[in-house]
Amino acid sequence: VLDALDDEIARLRKAIVDHIDQDPDLRQRRGWLESIPGISTRPSAVVLSHLDAFTRCATAKQWVAYAGLDCAIGQSGTSVRRRAAISKRGSAQLRRALYFPALSALTNNPIIRAFGDRLKGNGKRGKVVLCAAMRKLMHIIFGVLKNQQPFDPNAGLAVS
């Protein structure tokens, strides 16, 4: 049974890649996405599956909120104060697809590495840095797809 499921998963992954390869627009966008250090075939396919939502987002902030990586502050007057966390209101599939690319980007992407080092230097914990890296990766993905150009680390992205 497990072998049959593994075969089906492999067949579906190949079908997804073949579908992207057959459409020139999707193939070009996949190339732009995979030019970002940390993004490979599977995460780019997940991002491409959310293109409809991407076209409705006018700003990178909206795109980040769609993924549920925006900040949710729990505060009720002066009585209840909890630590800020990501809202998780958006696409869990997109967040899940960006988890390992963000880990990879913290070592391989110069912009996200400098950003993560700065946050660690400010005393932020590992998961906080990782969520911030996922958010930064979403901003980079937004810029690459909006500008319709491959990733360029020297293209004026602020390291903040």
Pin down the residues of each PLM region:
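A detector of single, family-specific signature residues
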Residues: 1-160
